[in-house]
């Protein structure tokens, strides 16, 4: 299965128009705060299956401004959250008073805190085996009851179509609620867009 096939099969069941946004250099950045985001995710977790969220900062926003295809990737998920302080500052100056910085690590921490209670399952894709082992140890010691569905460190080279299909099947078999992708920008956003659905 190739990337195009994933996109053809994906049909969003929630409305992007329900999310307030501030367009910054062509990227629709969610004009929200952490509380709004956590409530939204908790209330729509099943409907968001197969979708993605970009954690956007100044670097990714400028890159999207300069690269039309990457801009489509940034805008193609359910939302792009304001990881960069300057993004939320621009939004606030434009009248979006509730637009606050939401860093990737802070979002992860907040999701992990409620995961045992909500029964959320997590899959981690990216980095090295050593880093994933350390992450597993920290998460299971810090967030009691967290369900880690799986972890995978992809090769540091382009994957073959067969390898990609195998890992997608492996991830799907674990039935995660969240797939945390750590490949570095812009690679991670492109991976999420290619595997949307």
Labelled PLM ranges:
Residues 66-67, 92-94, 136-137, 191-194:
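Short amphipathic alpha-helical segments
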Residues 88-174:
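Conserved beta-alpha
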Residues 57-58, 126-128, 183-185:
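Short, well-ordered beta-to-alpha junction loops that form the rim of enzyme active sites
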Residues 163-197:
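A contiguous pocket-lining binding segment that forms or flanks enzyme active sites
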Residues 78, 149, 177:
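Conserved acidic residues
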Residues 68-72, 138-141, 196-197:
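Short, solvent-exposed amphipathic alpha-helical segments in soluble enzyme
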Residues 1, 119, 195-197:
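N-terminal hydrophobic signal-anchor/signal peptide
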Residues 2-101, 105-106:
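N-terminal nucleotide/polyanion-binding subdomain common to many enzyme families
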């Amino acid at each position: 299965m190739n990337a195009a096939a994933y996109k053809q099969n994906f049909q969003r069941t929630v409305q992007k128009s329900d999310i307030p946004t501030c367009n910054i250099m062509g990227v629709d950045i969610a004009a929200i705060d952490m509380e709004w985001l956590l409530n939204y995710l908790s209330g729509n977790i099943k409907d968001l299956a197969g979708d993605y969220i970009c954690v956007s900062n100044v670097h990714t926003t400028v890159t999207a401004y300069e690269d039309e295809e990457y801009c489509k990737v940034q805008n193609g998920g359910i939302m792009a959250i304001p990881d960069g302080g300057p993004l939320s500052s621009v939004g606030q100056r434009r009248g979006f008073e509730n637009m606050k910085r939401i860093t990737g690590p802070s979002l992860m921490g907040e999701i992990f805190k409620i995961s045992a209670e909500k029964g959320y399952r997590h899959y981690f894709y990216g980095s090295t085996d050593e880093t994933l082992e350390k992450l597993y140890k920290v998460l299971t010691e810090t967030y009691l009851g967290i369900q880690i569905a799986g972890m995978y460190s992809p090769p540091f080279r382009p994957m073959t179509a067969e390898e990609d299909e195998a890992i997608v099947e492996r991830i799907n078999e674990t039935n995660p609620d969240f797939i945390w992708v750590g490949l570095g920008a812009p690679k991670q956003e492109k991976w999420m867009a290619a595997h949307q659905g």
